[in-house]
């Protein structure tokens, strides 16, 4: 007589143990109507909880539950397999080609960025070397032109409103080019800089020649290079010495050769 009440009491307990089970919703379409059914999925943890909490459930009931668990697991696996889209070989090839295209596109953009950075660095290097450093051609030319404007002899022969031009190797086009220097190292390790350019005024036109030599004794940037000679040659006039060696020293070098001839190449050529 006690068996039935105990079995009756065990059903709510079993149902309570099955409450945390996962619900699987199934859509069934029949004509214009769609039916949604929720089916509880029993996991192994639920079976172990059920066996511990309801000792009066028969082995037959547990076996039925286990069987239903396996069936529900198979149904869930089949549902996942059906829900996952199948990718064909053609689509996989297109995906690989798309990835390759993105890779090359990013590589192209990266190359453009690196090239722009390199060009920016070259521009900055040119600005620093030519405009800031005392050994730059622009700094040397500006310094020499200011020295010419300060010289009274040059201004008297050339006239006012001085203008400068390039070395003039290629006619008018060559004279319109900015002055370019030539550089070399002597046997003492000092750097030498040579520069020639034309200077014209209202009256005449002359050619300026200069040589700078590295001053290893001075640590000042303004005195890093000193004039070895700086002269201006004007047709029909004597050579005018702007800076560097004194006039008598330059004349002495020209007249102290053997038999009155200066052997070798002159420094101002």
From Swiss-Prot:
Keywords per UniProt: Membrane, Mitochondrion, Mitochondrion inner membrane, Protein transport, Transit peptide, Translocation, Transmembrane, Transmembrane helix, Transport
Major localisation: mitochondrion
GO biological process: protein import into mitochondrial matrix
Transmembrane segments annotated in the record for this chain: 108-128
Subcellular location: Mitochondrion inner membrane
Positions in the Mitochondrial intermembrane compartment: 129-269
Protein topology in the membrane: Single-pass membrane protein
Pfam families: TIM21
Gene Ontology annotations for the cellular component aspect, listed alphabetically: TIM23 mitochondrial import inner membrane translocase complex
Transit sequence range: 1-76
InterPro entries according to UniProt: Tim21 (IPR013261), Tim21_IMS_sf (IPR038552)
Mitochondrial matrix topology ranges: 77-107
Function summary: Essential component of the TIM23 complex, a complex that mediates the translocation of transit peptide-containing proteins across the mitochondrial inner membrane. Required to keep the TOM and the TIM23 complexes in close contact. At some point, it is released from the TOM23 complex to allow protein translocation into the mitochondrial matrix.
Family that this chain belongs to: Belongs to the TIM21 family.
Quaternary structure, from the entry: Component of the TIM23 complex, at least composed of TIM23, TIM17, TIM50 and TIM21.
Matching PANTHER family: MITOCHONDRIAL IMPORT INNER MEMBRANE TRANSLOCASE SUBUNIT TIM21
Protein name listed in UniProt: Mitochondrial import inner membrane translocase subunit TIM21
Gene that produces this protein: TIM21
């Amino acid at each position: 007589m006690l068996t039935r009440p105990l079995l009756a009491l065990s059903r709510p307990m079993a149902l309570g143990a099955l409450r945390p089970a996962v619900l699987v919703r199934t859509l069934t379409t029949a004509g214009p109507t769609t039916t949604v059914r929720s089916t509880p999925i029993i996991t192994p943890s639920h079976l172990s909880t059920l066996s511990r909490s309801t000792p009066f459930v028969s082995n037959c009931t547990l076996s039925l539950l286990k069987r239903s668990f396996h069936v529900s697991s198979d149904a869930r696996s089949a549902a996942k397999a059906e829900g996952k889209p199948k990718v064909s070989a053609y689509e996989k090839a297109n995906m690989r080609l798309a990835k390759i295209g993105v890779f090359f596109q990013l590589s192209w953009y990266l190359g453009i960025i690196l090239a722009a950075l390199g060009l920016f660095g070259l521009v900055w290097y040119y600005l620093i070397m030519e405009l800031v450093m005392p050994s730059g051609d622009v700094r040397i030319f500006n310094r020499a032109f200011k020295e010419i404007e300060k010289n009274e002899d040059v201004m008297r022969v050339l006239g006012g409103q001085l203008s400068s031009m390039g070395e003039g190797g290629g006619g008018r086009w060559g004279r319109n080019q900015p002055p370019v220097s030539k550089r070399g190292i002597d046997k003492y390790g000092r750097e030498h800089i040579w520069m020639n350019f034309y200077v014209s005024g209202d009256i005449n036109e002359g050619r300026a020649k200069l040589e700078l030599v590295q001053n290893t004794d001075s640590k000042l940037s303004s005195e890093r290079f000193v004039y070895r000679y700086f002269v201006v040659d004007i047709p029909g006039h004597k050579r005018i010495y702007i800076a560097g060696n004194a006039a008598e020293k330059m004349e002495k070098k020209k007249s102290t050769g053997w038999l009155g001839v200066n052997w070798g190449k002159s420094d101002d050529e």
